[in-house]
Amino acid sequence: MRYLDEVGLPHPCTRYAKIWNEIQEAVSYLGKPCYIKTDYGTASTGVWCIKNDHDLNFLKESLTAKGIINGQTEFLIQEASSGIFEQLHAIFDQGRLIAIHCTRRLKEGLGGGAIIKVGVDRPIVRKDLEKIGESLKWHGSLSMDYFYHEADDRAYYIDANPRITEPMNSVVNGINFAEMQIRLSLGKSIPTNYIDQITNKSHSTIQALLAAAGQRYSRLDVLKEMCLVATKKGIYKNSRESITPVAKDFPSIILLSAVLFQLLYNPRSGQMQAQKAISNYSLGTAIPKISGMKPEEYFGFNAKTNKNIS
């Protein structure tokens, strides 16, 4: 957020705190609802929505028990933003914006992720990203979350990831960020790529099933959602599968079936499955340590002795 202030890009009103009294003062200033965030997090972990005093007291107890309120960890307290939740996915070559694709969340899943999304055209976001790329001389991928205000055609940015995230809607709309990232890593030149057709939809059946199970812990809800997806009815009409496209990748039916049968056996397992998936790829508390590591330590290998670091 501080960087956004430096380059003059909008974001919801934000305060910073390291001790609980500062957090309370920030919440009082911003009002409720508001959000409290840790400096690092994945898939909305480390983010808490504070709607009332009970939420705030519960969070204090939780953070105190974890030893996080130690005067060292910085928290970001941010007002709840209005507008439409969207995401951008972009790739740069030494500061030059090569390609960008924006998506709107049509249906929310567990942890705030998108069950189904559609491509949208946001010239103002492209302009903002060109400014970021030039300022940082960014090289590689960048993804950001924002709330779009149609009234004044502005994007209010709330989160950033220095990587590719959920690229399949880009693919169904004509941009393959994964391929571009590989070409860029190999030092190949990539022309600027802007597309005209950006309104195709994509969805994740697994996300849909997990969310259906999490609402009322109902097997019937899970089956109903599976039928809607399979028959492409309702919001899933003209949408393409992004994770388990069984028609093109038949072995993916194994993963889909495993999730479906687990949820039918125990609908309450959905939240646990989602958390387990996040923990498998999240760097979590390791992130602050990375800046102090040597390159060979990233992979547990000592280049000088050719021995694994145990």
Per-segment meaning from a language model:
Residues 8-11, 40-44, 111:
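Short glycine-enriched loop/turn motifs at secondary-structure junctions
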Residues 44, 106-111, 116-117, 161-175:
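Glycine-rich phosphate/pyrophosphate-binding beta-alpha loops
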Residues 4, 27-49, 69-83, 100-104:
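ATP-grasp fold ATP-binding core
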Residues 53, 57-111, 117-128, 132, ...:
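Phosphate-binding site of ATP-dependent enzymes
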Residues 121-148, 162-217:
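Active-site "cap" helix and flanking loop/linker of ATP-utilizing ligase/carboxylase catalytic domains
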Residues 1-21, 25:
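Conserved N-proximal alpha/beta basic substrate-recognition cap immediately N-terminal to
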Residues 17-23, 40-43, 55, 81-83, ...:
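Short acidic/polar capping segments at secondary-structure boundaries
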Residues 23, 183-310:
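Peripheral (often C-terminal) accessory segments that flank ATP-dependent C-N-forming ligase machineries
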